[in-house]
Amino acid sequence: MSIPANTIQKDKMMHSDYYTQSQGPTVEQQPEWQASVQPYSDPHAYSPSFYMNMSQVPHFLPAQVDPFIYPNTLGSYGGDKQVQCLWETNGQVCMHVCQNSGELSTHISSNHITHDSKFVCLWKGCDREFKMFKAKYKLVNHMRVHTGERPFLCDVCNKVFARSENLKIHKRIHSGEKPFQCTHNGCTKLFANSSDRKKHMHVHSSHKPYSCMYPDCGKTYTHPSSLRKHTKVHENEKKSQLSPEHDESSDSGNASIGTPTTDESLTFSPENIKRDQHLHTMHTFMDRPNPFMQMYQNQFSNPTYHMFMAKPDSY
């Protein structure tokens, strides 16, 4: 059975028209409202041409940012990142590129930290301000702060540490070892590290170094956990002060979100600030022009559209 030539031609034209429409209307075919709408552009999206020409625009001058920040990574997301050596000697920064933090530590130990040199950290921007270390290994351990190297791995939970002492203390969590005993007479409590024992010793003395930071409170405690429990009391008081205002606004039938309050103590609370930010965000979204909504409103108000709607009495 042969297909007529005009049928094939019409079929080709139909597919051609559909393909053209699927690519989107041209400028002449766009509705008037759509032609006036500017295409959306994300101001935070990366555009190579924008950043390359940014220095040529007068009001987009490069920001004065210190490039010698830790860590100075050159790689992309995922995997080991390339890092730069920022060791400074006689005003010259090394800038040697290493593939990872371990390679950077090896480079520093073999090239910059020698037995003949003084054990001083010359990393760009180091806050030690050229204070000397007593031994080379102490300087090597300090350099892990800048390089980010953590060579000591826990074989139980795979956590990594920069110092072997920290790994040793961490392993006591898994073993249950508590070698530090309270030295107070009659107290038999044991601790995994000396810092926890030091905090505990305040219980046996009148010294209370942890004080409440809330105004007009002045309470002091011997242990930070007691201070945290006390701080929650203040937080619950703040919430109870805000709850009557919330109930009053919800019962009024108004659903007024931004009801002003005369209590100055509640004006700058975190809850009020968060609620005010949500209010501004909601108004900004609602006031934003929506051309698609305008298109559907125009379509539904068109008399020709209602001619195709079924009448209720026709069923």
UniProtKB/Swiss-Prot annotation:
Q: Which SUPFAM superfamilies match?
A: beta-beta-alpha zinc fingers (SSF57667)
Q: Which GO terms describe its biological process?
A: anterior/posterior pattern specification; central nervous system development; negative regulation of transcription by RNA polymerase II; nematode larval development; neuron fate specification; positive regulation of transcription by RNA polymerase II; regulation of cell division
Q: Where is the composition biased (Polar residues)?
A: 251-270
- Annotated C2H2-type zinc fingers sit at 83-112, 124-146, 152-174, 180-204, 210-234
Presence of the UniProt keyword Zinc in the record: yes
Q: Which InterPro entries match?
A: GLI-like, Znf-C2H2_ZIC1-5/GLI1-3-like, Znf_C2H2_sf, Znf_C2H2_type
Q: Where is this region: Disordered?
A: 225-270
**Keywords on this record?**
Cytoplasm, Metal-binding, Nucleus, Repeat, Zinc, Zinc-finger
Protein's cellular compartments: Nucleus; Cytoplasm
Per its UniProt record, what PANTHER family does this chain match?
TRANSCRIPTIONAL ACTIVATOR CUBITUS INTERRUPTUS
This chain's function reads: Transcription factor. Modulates expression of target genes by binding to regulatory elements. Required for normal cell division timing and cell positioning in anterior lineages, acting in a cell-autonomous manner. Required for development, fusion and fate of cells of the ventral epidermis, the Pn.p cells, during larval development; acts in concert with homeobox genes lin-39 and mab-5. Required for the specification of the AIY interneuron.
- Protein name listed in UniProt: Zinc finger transcription factor ref-2
> What is the originating organism of this protein?
Caenorhabditis elegans
Classification from the root reads: Eukaryota, Metazoa, Ecdysozoa, Nematoda, Chromadorea
